[in-house]
Every structure is written in C-alpha cells, then in structure tokens.
C-alpha cells in the first residue's frame, strides 16, 4: 500500500492546468507565502512543497540505515502534524485532548483558508491568482482542487469558492462526518465537456440497502461547461504519450535510476509480486508435433 501511494501520489499535482493538493499552500498572516527554514535553507510556496515531496520520498527510498532515510522518516512526522506542513494545514494537532479531556481545544487553520475562502471574492481570487502564478498556471482556465476540510453542505456551504477558482472536494466520506456535512463526499468529474461535481448520499449498511432496496444516491451539478469540446490531444496525457515515443526511460542507466529514486527525484512504480500478476484461467497449451 505504501509503495502504491508513493507511485501514484504526491504532495501536489498539476494536471490540465489544474492544481491538485490535499491540505494547503502555507501562507502567513499577511497572505504571503510562508517562509520555512530547513537544513540551512529558506523555502516558500512551490519550493517548500517540492522540498516536502523530496523529503517524503527520501524517507522511504533512501538506503536502509542511511542518515538520509532517517531524516526523511523524521520529516514524515512533520508532514503529519507540523504547523507549516502543506498536508496538515493547522497550527497543532489536539486529537489527544479531544479524546481524553473535556473542553474546547481549537486547532487554528493556516491563514491560507481564511484568504482563499474569504467572503470578499476579490481577496479570494487575488490569493488564487498568486498561487497560480507561483505554480506557472493560467489563472483564467485553471482551478485549485482542494481536500482536507469537509464541506458543511447541510449548513448551505458550497464546494465551489473564490469565484469558481477553488473546488473543495472533501465532503466527509468518513462516516463520522456525515452528520456534520449532511452528505458522504464529492466526486469531481473532468470530461471533454467540462467540469462537474457529484455529491453522494450516505451509505448506512449493506443489510439496510438490501432490505429497503436502497442505493447510494448522487446528485450532479455541472458548474463549468467547456466552451469547446476537449480532446485527448489537448490534455497533459497527450504530451506524456508524445514524449514516450521520443525517449525511452528504460535506457536510463540502472545505477542512475536507483540514485534518483532514493533521493525522491523520480517516482517508483507500485511493486507487484509474481502472485499478483493476473494470469489467464485457461492458458493455451503447446502441442508437440
């Protein structure tokens, strides 16, 4: 499972001029990119998220027993609950207090959320514009796709914010959030005709679904139709397919690939043991003449 996460996941992803990430791009109280000092260097914005990506991969792929692997593993704990972690997005984790101590123990969110979700659309869009510029994306056609903070749909909160530039797709898939959110999560669908959101009703139990003939109900909301139909040749996938014909990564020396993987500069494919490789149920047999 961990190898699959490293092979398919990342701290952030850019796809078809959309910026996808789980938590936040850490900001300071003034709405500027938070400056983080680590290892004698100062990082902010995209550079900080790239550093987090490299350290996370270093903690898993660096040689066993090496200082690089130890530092990377320590850094994974910071990503989990650090105040300027782009995955955590809060000033502290108060899970222990919530579980064992009566009272309120607020976890203050990073200023990113106050700016990007600001009721003043000019402030929210201005923040989105700076983030798009930081990642080299076009503001007019792009979106930020965010998770982490459940959308309280039952209270009228909308998942599309900042004048359509921010899409929050965490609708509370976890059962513990259903009462708070009123739904069981969102699915963002990007098709050739535009973007749409599907909100899902909670699934109570298999027994109730069978006895009452219930299904998971989903509602669809097309919020940004495409001006013209998008074809495969217009996507980032087409660029990757084109590049694969021009160069074969398998020709990269094995020694160099292992070094890049250990430092977190390239992703590792998910491991599949021989038992996991699908085989035909009735393999053809060779006849001897």
Give each language-model segment a name.
Residues 1-289:
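Feature recognizes metal-dependent phosphohydrolase scaffolds
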């Amino acid at each position: 499972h961990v190898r699959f996460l490293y092979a398919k996941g990342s701290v952030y992803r850019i796809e078809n001029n959309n910026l996808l990430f789980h938590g936040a791009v850490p900001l300071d109280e003034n709405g500027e990119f938070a400056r983080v000092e680590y290892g004698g260097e100062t990082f902010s914005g995209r550079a900080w998220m790239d550093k987090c990506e490299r350290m996370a991969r270093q903690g898993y792929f660096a040689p066993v027993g090496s200082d690089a692997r130890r530092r990377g593993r320590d850094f994974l704990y910071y990503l989990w609950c650090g105040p300027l972690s782009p995955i955590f997005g809060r000033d502290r984790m108060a899970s222990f207090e919530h579980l064992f101590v009566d009272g309120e123990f607020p976890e203050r969110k990073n200023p990113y959320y106050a700016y990007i979700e600001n009721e003043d659309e000019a402030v929210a869009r201005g923040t989105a514009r700076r983030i798009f510029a930081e990642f080299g994306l076009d503001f007019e056609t792009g979106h930020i796709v965010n998770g982490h903070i459940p959308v309280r749909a039952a209270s009228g909160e909308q998942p599309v914010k900042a004048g359509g530039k921010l899409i929050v797709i965490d609708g509370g898939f976890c059962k513990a959030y259903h009462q708070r959110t009123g739904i069981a999560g969102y699915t963002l669908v990007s098709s050739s005709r535009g973007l749409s959101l599907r909100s899902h009703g909670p699934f109570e139990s298999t027994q109730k679904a069978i006895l009452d003939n219930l299904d998971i109900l989903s509602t669809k909301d097309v919020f940004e139709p495409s001006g013209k139909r998008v074809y495969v040749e217009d996507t980032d996938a087409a660029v990757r397919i084109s590049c694969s014909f021009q160069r074969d990564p398998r020709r990269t020396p094995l020694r160099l690939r292992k070094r890049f993987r250990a430092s977190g500069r390239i992703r590792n494919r998910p491991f599949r043991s021989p038992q996991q490789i699908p085989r035909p149920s009735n393999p053809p047999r060779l006849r001897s003449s």
